[in-house]
Amino acid sequence: MPVQMNQDIKAAPSNASANTPVKKRVFSGIQPTGNLHLGNYLGALRNWAQTQAEYDNIFCIVDLHALTMPIAPQELRQATRSLAALYLACGLDTRYCNLFIQSHVHEHPEMSWILSCYTPMGWLNRMTQFKTKAGENPDTVSTGLYCYPVLMACDILLYQTNYVPVGDDQRQHIEFTRDIAQRFNSLYGQQVFTIPEGQIRTVGARIMALDDPTKKMSKSDPNPGSRINLLDDPKTIKQKIAHATTDSQRLVAFDPERPGITNLLTIYQALTGQSEQEIESEFASQGYGDLKAALTERLVTTLAPIQQRHKELLSDLPTLDAVLKQGADNVRPIAAATLQHVKDVIGLG
């Protein structure tokens, strides 16, 4: 099934009639590193696919951010295309969104340099994610890792973004972006940047690790058994669910004091749409093995069409690249207009 090229999306809403409300703009970026997992799908991708017609959506594969940690060139290229295919396979539709690669729009690094000149060092020193990734060797990591919150802010502000879908653990980055925008606007006494708001995910946002249900499922977790990747085959899914942490009790019920079984039930609930009461009733006379078997079957059924579509998209790279090029062509005028406005305001050119 070929990818449908979007001929309807415009780079700016200037052609809207006076009676046509302009849609709010949503921006989201994700690095082409690691594997997209079930938490990404239930907490973000599925919801984006369901609500994409309501917004002016810009989805960016932030390959420049991926350079902050060591990665082989061919691995980066392959991961970028695979991620693009997975986005589309999960239901993103180019009639309602633009999907592009960050490095294909040169305004990103140029704006990042400008904004870095307006960002106090103290703001960057407070960013907890750098401290986490740098670990005990902060002097050996790249400057890019230290400064990447500025590039992230630039990604958002370039497109005059209204909303940024984020998890609760990314609140700090949104506040950082808002601080930069407000500081710049205040300094020059005009509304150069739209002040973005974070859309904090709720449904499916707290999918926890299978091996340690006290922490979130993460693509950066060194233990592959901690997560269900969207491209895991049925055998792998079965093994991971079979080894998922539970407890010594037998009652299948939602209980915050029993995070392991509650995590599996939460995943089952997100996949089936059933209420807690309906699920507990379904498994009232059954045990953990029955729940794990039912959950495995539901996961395999849910992910099979996504995996098939992903395979089809990667089998036709010219068409996939054309979609990414079109996305970049559509959004570049927005980024260029914002960058030019900034240059005019600060006296460049």
What are the functions of these language-model segments?
Residues I30-P32, D63-H65, N162-Y163, D221, ...:
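Short, histidine-centered active-site or binding-site loop motifs used for metal coordination
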Residues M121-N125, L158-P165, Q269-I279:
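Short helix-capping/linker segments at secondary-structure and domain boundaries
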Residues T33, Q74, L99, H106, ...:
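A broad, structure-centric signal for solvent-exposed, well-ordered loop/edge residues
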Residues P2-C154, K311:
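N-terminal Rossmann-like or analogous alpha/beta NTP/dinucleotide-binding catalytic cores
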Residues L36-A44, A49, I58, V62, ...:
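Structured ligand/cofactor/substrate-binding pocket environments in proteins
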Residues S28-I30, I101, Q160, D211, ...:
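Pocket-edge structural micro-motifs
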Residues Q172, R178-G349:
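Conserved nucleotide- and phosphate/pyrophosphate-binding catalytic cores
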